[in-house]
């Protein structure tokens, strides 16, 4: 059974392993320089400290999905002044996709955003990530903008969910 919860320091090795596996699954989908750069960053000695700082920060949201003691998905983002949150990343390891874990993590992120007084959750994604786009649309996110050649030669779509 998959359990979604806030990340803890003891999760950091599993979090990084999950993060790397998710990014490796983007090989051949996203630009190589982008993917390999993220994977390389996750392997740096300073990366665990970066994750630990985010876990401890009151303006950050880091959630994990755990299955049989193993981190199989995660969502991370920031609560910003002005009442909105930014979902920086959400991902599930390939062998655990299509099981509702991404939806559970996104629901958890929205819940944490509400608890922090947010009235809007925003994110961006590449148009080639069709499963992510479907999830965001199914959860009520609406496109607010399109950024051409935004990063690493990729276009990005800016989405938001307005909370009531």
Residue ranges and their predicted role:
Residues 6-12, 16-89, 93-94, 106-108, ...:
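Acetyl-CoA-dependent GNAT
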Residues 10, 116, 124:
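Residue-level signal for short amphipathic helical patches enriched in basic/charged
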Residues 70, 89, 93-107, 114-116, ...:
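Conserved glycine-rich acetyl-CoA-binding loop
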């Amino acid at each position: 059974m998959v359990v979604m919860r806030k990340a803890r320091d003891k999760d950091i090795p599993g979090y990084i392993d999950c993060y790397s596996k998710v990014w490796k699954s983007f090989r051949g989908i996203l630009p190589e320089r982008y993917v390999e750069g993220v994977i390389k960053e996750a392997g740096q000695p300073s990366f665990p400290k970066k994750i630990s700082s985010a876990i401890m920060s009151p303006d950050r949201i880091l959630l994990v999905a755990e299955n049989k003691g193993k981190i199989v998905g995660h969502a991370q983002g920031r609560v910003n002044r002005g009442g909105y949150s930014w979902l920086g990343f959400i991902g599930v390891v390939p062998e655990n996709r299509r099981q509702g874990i991404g939806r559970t993590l996104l629901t958890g992120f929205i819940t944490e955003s509400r608890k922090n007084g947010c009235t809007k959750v925003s994110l961006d994604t590449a148009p080639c990530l069709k499963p992510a786009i479907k999830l965001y649309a199914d959860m009520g996110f609406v496109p607010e903008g399109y950024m051409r050649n935004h990063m690493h030669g990729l276009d990005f779509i800016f989405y938001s969910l307005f909370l009531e």
